[in-house]
């Protein structure tokens, strides 16, 4: 019998393109869910913002909606687990509860010049040594610098003593607790470029370097711990919040990657590969990131990560930008209509290139277009590029580690695409394992929250109960797929350093 009499765990998965609430029962099954798409704001080329008020209002709405549609009372929820898009950050006024500017999203490149300046000043080695990260606009530090300077210039009446800073988890936690708790967890803090990976605390030297007062930053706590409880005025009850993860780390937790060498890839807006590295920080020699996987009151687990900025975002661009598809599912049908791309290669550098290149001046491109190329060839080239980017990172991981990648666990929206998953298996030459529940980020947050309050007793048995939907084995096209990787790499080299 479970120790906790409540019947459900509520997972909040606050992502880049939308926000989701999912209820999990004692069997680890989804009992209900609700979703709200999130507005994207592009004020200038290369800039991307979210309205933090919209994220908070959506969070309240999706919680109320999932409870209403399932006819479940709030008191039946044992705990809340929160997982969020990482690096996206904001400043807000604690006296008004209002953001001082839109949140700056992880894909935003507005701080490229500041990052370039830091590199020319020789700060790369120090920052990587302290944080495990590579100087890039992707991370929160330069975004917070920009926001503080913007507030000083445009809203000088705001007193710094009233300003709070944080990633999306800190903002939502602060609101859920009625402004009582200003905290984050180690997995999110490790993505700011401000947390020392060895001490797992804010690094004073880096705070000074980026001009960020430590007092405005949230307290860092273990991922699996008691963060506070919901303000009863919000939903009618006090519900404990007992796990916070960055979205990719939550997926790693859901896949049961709790031993060194276990690897997962989430195909979302970007693709994110994380390999569990154990309880010691593992330093990369191949442009991968060292990061916190998750932490408990007693220990911390680390990981190596390859962050790819554009995967699902490229499919969204085909739909909304080029308007050559009506929906994401169409990409599979179109790709199967042709046997190859007719020599077309796509470089998905719509927000620069992440791992293993880290080139903020790269730009997206199609190469090899001739008169006989149709939209199906372009669409197939985009899917192939998503898989080839993952291969680049897996190759880097294999160079890095004594633990060679023997299989890849996958999740996220694009992992529903059977063509892409088979192509991925052929490109890597290893099996691809797709679970029945693809919402691994929400599942990981739920597992963490439930284990913390004793809703579930044992992590291993929880993982063992997960159902595998399909395993994609490398097929007869494997040799051709791997041969085409070489000209694709040539295309990538041509797209790099495009903007001078």
UniProtKB/Swiss-Prot annotation:
Which residue spans traverse the membrane?
none
- Positions contributing to ADP binding: 16, 20, 269, 312, 413, 417
Sequence positions that bind ATP:
16-17, 269, 312, 316, 413
GO MF terms here are: ATP binding; glycerol kinase activity
Q: Where does glycerol bind?
A: 86-87, 138, 247-248
Taxonomically, the superkingdom here is Bacteria
Q: How is its activity regulated?
A: Inhibited by fructose 1,6-bisphosphate (FBP).
Identify the metabolic or biological route this protein is part of. Answer: Polyol metabolism; glycerol degradation via glycerol kinase pathway; sn-glycerol 3-phosphate from glycerol: step 1/1
Q: Where is it found, in Gene Ontology cellular component terms?
A: cytosol
Q: Which SUPFAM superfamilies match?
A: Actin-like ATPase domain
Entries under PROSITE patterns matching the protein: FGGY_KINASES_2
Family classification: Belongs to the FGGY kinase family.
Q: Write down what this protein is called.
A: Glycerol kinase
